[in-house]
Amino acid sequence: MRWYHSQMTQYHIAINGFFWDKPTVGVGQYVHGLVTALATFPDLRITLYVPADTTPPTAPGGVTITRLRSPFSGRSKNMAKVMFEQLAIPAAARLDQVDLIHVPNFAPPLSSRIPVITTIPDLIPLKRPAYRGSLRVRAYTALVQRAARNSAQLLAISTTVADDAARLLGHARGDIDVTYLAADPIYQPDQSTDDIRTRYHLPASYIYYVGGHDERKNVSTVIRAYAALPSLLRQQYPLVIAGKAVGTNPVLFPDIDALIVQLGIAADIHRIEVTRDDNPAVYGGAACFVYPSCDEGFGLPPLEAMACRTAVIASHAACMPEVLGDAALLVDPFDISAWTDALTKVLSDAVLRESLVTAGSVRAAMYSYQRTAAATHAAYMRVIAGQRGQA
């Protein structure tokens, strides 16, 4: 519904806020960054729909949070999520007379009287069989795959994802817009590294990894490459691994602790659970950051490390070359000896390390959520104008 204030047309946008209370995961970071930036557009009135059984963080000024109950709330977590996406949001949007629904993850409603824009963060479940192993997951994937085809507009967070979406969802590539992500503003050089080292029992110098532990993250490659370093170099630069597996399926979540013990390098590896607020300082205290993932939609951690002025070694798979350019040392994700060589070079060559720091800082500054929001706003306006033209 169009609202008028001081002669300005204002459009009502409803956003699926399922991940609003999950700011440490990629989609949650995207939603927070996007909504915060969109709130500065005077021609938008934004309503964020969140599940009724969550305690959502405060929204930016001008953004309304509406809590929606759905069938299965408080009973089945998975079914409650599906009903929230498929029934509660379209119904609320219709009652609220919104102009557009934006679903910022791969979870669009199959049927909606209100036009839907869907952002595709990645299509991992369609590309990698291990991620759709159960019947429930396969059924859900088929549902949202079909629903995505009904979206008025698809957005993708990288050209890599846009190409995947054209191939796997049947959309014309020219109809899919790319809206890049960005590192959150909290990721910048932090002077509190000494305090963080004490709190997390970190060594003076270290190699850092933070991210998922599922199989596509390929953490075992870095562990094996690290084990091949000379023992003196390992002692000088322990490997700090943050995060943990969130499942028990050994195919999806390889046992990296068993691998560490098997390789005899447990004394040189530190396992930590780091908070979001402390993560910038942990990045900043590292000699380098490693990211061996073999499949990503965007890959925020390397960009966060760059924003914190830390040298990055990453895989050259999927979107990594697109996002990181020549500001990171890019390596074949499965070539263990190449990873060992890359680690040796970066740790032993201060000039190379500083050049990566400088290039990375420039690269990270190329991305911002204000740019993401501007591209998203343009998509909103095109879809709304198209709907008005059909009326």
Predicted feature locations:
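Carbohydrate transferase catalytic cores enriched for Leloir-type hexosyltransferases
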Residues: 1-391
